[in-house]
């Protein structure tokens, strides 16, 4: 059964259908930290605790009254920190997925390139095999021709076939040896016989033509073999170049595999982090999940019409909530944190009161705080505080009026308001409007400013007089100390003589009189200073200087006098000791 939730003095209430004249009254006390909800029956009655089940007649209920039971609502709360971390992990996963897609595309391109290179290498290998077969055949033909030529030229020593130039050369050598060498007649005859045999062989022209034909054939075969070898070398160079490219592509493919594995590992870590964060978020929503069966049970009891059980159940839940609220501070803080968004939706403060409409509700804009602002003087602060009191009274009156208007407006338009946007409120100071001030207030302000100025002038004058009196007292004290020092020096000089004349006694009396005058002057200066301080009582200042109080330092002249007195005593005692030692030494001799 769906029902519209409306506002009634800070509570969430479900109105019964077809009851336009129904008015729900909440408690007058402000419920600051509890969101409440009600349950209704299928007949449209809002239960509050005294009605009987749904089979009642009009005689039992002469006056139809709605009964409301309020349950503590545990709204769902998403921790912004956890939500930000989950969003960040989701962005990381998206980035890793994009990187994985890029790496996969690069791997596919590398694999396609390797396949194309393998295809080129396969065609070149088949060509190289064909060229190798041709070379083998040419070599076999060349060897056969070479063998036939060899058989033709030198089968035996008697059947040698020489050309005409070779025979002429041999004849020339033989004649030269005969003319210049030491060869006998028998050897000469043998050489002549050999030459004659050769002359007989030269006459065979068929063998010479066959020889020339075989030589030409061998030369042509050699040229063809060289061309085939060059083509085979070019093909092998291309195959080696392609194999190098394949090796580089395979290395790149391995690098991409490692990179992809690293990306997948990081993505899995992000998935694990998201799982942990979601578990943490669900733990934070445990109260919301626990409240769901409570509300379900309450709706079931309301639908069945079991009012007394519903009343007992509502009171037990309220008692349980209040015990947790009173005993556990962490529970209170958690519930306040959960309820704050709902309060912002309903334009309520944390104490349950409706917000002031003049207050600007802005959470997204944060006011920048400047740390290096200068501190104004206390006197100016006093004057500004006095002058701002009158404006604050007027603004307070206007605030009260606007609050009353806002309360009436919210009560009248509670049924029509349906807040869906979640706003986070930050309270800022309202802007000061230009206010019309009466002449009497202006005169009062001017009079207060003049009084403040007079007070400040008197305080300055008092401080100057205190400083002058202190300086005069210090000066008189210094003069007195000087005179005392001079008198002590004169007394020391006169103490050396045993007898004193009457003139000297008169002089000492004058010195004592002068000392008494100096002392009286110093005392009178101090009394005058104290009287001046009593005439101008010191007003309270806002500048506090906490300084530790130590012993007051003695004047320098008194310290010097004490030192001189000590030196004189020590000098006399040391002189007496020296005289005694001198006498002892004389007696011992």
From Swiss-Prot:
The keyword Transport does not apply. It is found in: Cell membrane; Endoplasmic reticulum membrane. It is a single-pass membrane protein. InterPro entries: PPI1-4. One of its GO terms (biological process) is regulation of proton transport. Residues 205-245, 431-500 form a coiled coil. One of its GO terms (cellular component) is endoplasmic reticulum membrane. The chain crosses the membrane at residues 568-588. Residues 370-383, 395-408, 426-450, 504-534 have a biased composition (Basic and acidic residues). The keyword Endoplasmic reticulum applies. Expressed in seedlings and flowers. It comes from the Eukaryota. Belongs to the plant Proton pump-interactor protein family. May regulate plasma membrane ATPase activity. This is Proton pump-interactor 2.
């Amino acid at each position: 059964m769906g029902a519209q939730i409306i506002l009634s003095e800070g509570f969430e209430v479900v109105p019964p259908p077809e009851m336009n004249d129904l008015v729900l009254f909440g408690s007058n006390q402000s419920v600051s930290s509890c969101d409440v909800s009600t349950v209704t029956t299928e007949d449209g009655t809002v239960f509050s605790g005294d009605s009987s089940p749904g089979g009642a007649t009009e005689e039992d209920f002469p006056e139809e009254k709605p009964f409301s039971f309020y349950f503590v609502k545990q709204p769902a709360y998403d921790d912004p920190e956890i939500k930000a971390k989950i969003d960040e992990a989701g962005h990381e996963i998206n980035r890793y997925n994009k990187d994985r897609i890029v790496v996969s595309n690069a791997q596919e391109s590398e694999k396609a390139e390797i396949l194309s290179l393998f295809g080129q290498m396969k065609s070149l290998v088949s060509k190289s095999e064909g060229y190798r077969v041709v070379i083998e055949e040419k070599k076999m033909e060349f060897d056969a021709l070479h063998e036939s030529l060899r058989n033709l030229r030198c089968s035996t020593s008697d059947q040698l076939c020489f050309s005409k130039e070779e025979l002429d050369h041999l004849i020339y050598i033989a004649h030269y040896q005969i003319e210049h060498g030491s060869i006998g007649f028998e050897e000469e005859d043998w050489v002549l016989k050999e030459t004659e045999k050769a002359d007989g062989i030269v006459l065979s022209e068929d063998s010479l033509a066959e020889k020339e034909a075989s030589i030409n054939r061998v030369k042509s075969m050699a040229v063809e073999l060289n061309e085939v070898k060059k083509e085979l070398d070019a093909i092998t160079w291309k195959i080696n170049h392609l194999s190098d490219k394949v090796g580089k592509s395979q290395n790149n493919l391995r690098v991409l595999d490692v990179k992809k594995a690293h990306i997948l590992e990081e993505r899995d870590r992000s998935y694990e982090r998201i799982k942990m964060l979601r578990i943490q978020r669900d733990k934070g929503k445990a109260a919301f999940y626990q409240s769901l069966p409570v509300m379900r049970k309450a709706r079931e009891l309301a639908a069945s019409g079991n009012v007394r059980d519903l009343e007992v159940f509502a009171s037990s839940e309220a008692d349980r909530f209040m015990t947790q609220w009173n005993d556990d501070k962490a529970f209170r803080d958690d519930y306040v944190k959960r309820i704050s968004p709902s309060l912002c939706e309903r334009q309520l403060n944390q104490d349950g009161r409706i917000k002031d409409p003049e207050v600007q509700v802005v959470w997204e804009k944060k006011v920048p705080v400047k740390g290096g602002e200068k501190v104004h003087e206390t006197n100016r602060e006093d004057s500004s505080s006095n002058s701002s009191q009158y404006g604050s009274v007027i603004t307070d009156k206007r605030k009260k009026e606007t609050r009353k208007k806002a309360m009436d407006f919210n009560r009248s338009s509670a049924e029509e308001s349906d807040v869906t946007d979640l706003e986070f409120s930050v309270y800022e100071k309202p802007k000061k409007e230009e206010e019309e001030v009466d002449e009497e207030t202006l005169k009062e302000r001017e009079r207060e400013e003049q009084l403040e100025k007079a007070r400040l002038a008197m305080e300055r004058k008092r401080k100057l007089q205190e400083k002058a009196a202190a300086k005069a007292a210090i000066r008189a004290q210094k003069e007195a100390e000087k005179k005392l020092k001079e008198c002590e020096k004169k007394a020391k000089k006169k103490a050396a003589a045993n007898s004193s004349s009457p003139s000297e006694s008169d002089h000492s009396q004058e010195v004592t009189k002068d000392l008494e005058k100096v002392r009286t002057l110093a005392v009178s200066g101090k009394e005058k200073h104290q009287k001046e301080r009593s005439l101008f009582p010191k007003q309270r200042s806002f500048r506090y200087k906490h300084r530790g109080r130590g012993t007051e330092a003695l004047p320098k002249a008194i310290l010097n006098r004490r030192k001189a007195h000590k030196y004189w005593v020590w000098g006399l005692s040391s002189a007496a000791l020296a005289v005694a030692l001198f006498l002892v030494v004389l007696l011992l001799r």
